[in-house]
């Protein structure tokens, strides 16, 4: 199950640069993080759901690549984003 429209709109409002910003790296990483967190709860109940696990690994890989791009191009925005999302410890 994917994120609801309201949840996506809230993430867009929080992380987007402008009102209709859906493609910036920050928004994409925030949406992927929300989907990954949602799927982690799914896997606590459905341990053997390997098809969805493949999708989870794909999302994690995409998020990792976007974060690497953001770190390489604009380190300040990268630091702010990981602090907001609580990704690095």
Curated annotation (Swiss-Prot):
Molecular-function GO term, any one: structural constituent of ribosome
Lineage: superkingdom: Bacteria
Pfam families documented for this protein: Ribosomal_S15
InterPro entries named among the record's database cross-references: Ribosomal_uS15 (IPR000589), Ribosomal_uS15_bac-type (IPR005290), uS15_NS1_RNA-bd_sf (IPR009068)
One CC-aspect GO term: cytosolic small ribosomal subunit
UniProt keyword list: Ribonucleoprotein, Ribosomal protein, RNA-binding, rRNA-binding
Single Gene Ontology BP annotation: translation
Subunit structure: Part of the 30S ribosomal subunit. Forms a bridge to the 50S subunit in the 70S ribosome, contacting the 23S rRNA.
Family classification: Belongs to the universal ribosomal protein uS15 family.
Annotated function: One of the primary rRNA binding proteins, it binds directly to 16S rRNA where it helps nucleate assembly of the platform of the 30S subunit by binding and bridging several RNA helices of the 16S rRNA. Forms an intersubunit bridge (bridge B4) with the 23S rRNA of the 50S subunit in the ribosome.
Name of the protein: Small ribosomal subunit protein uS15
Gene label: rpsO
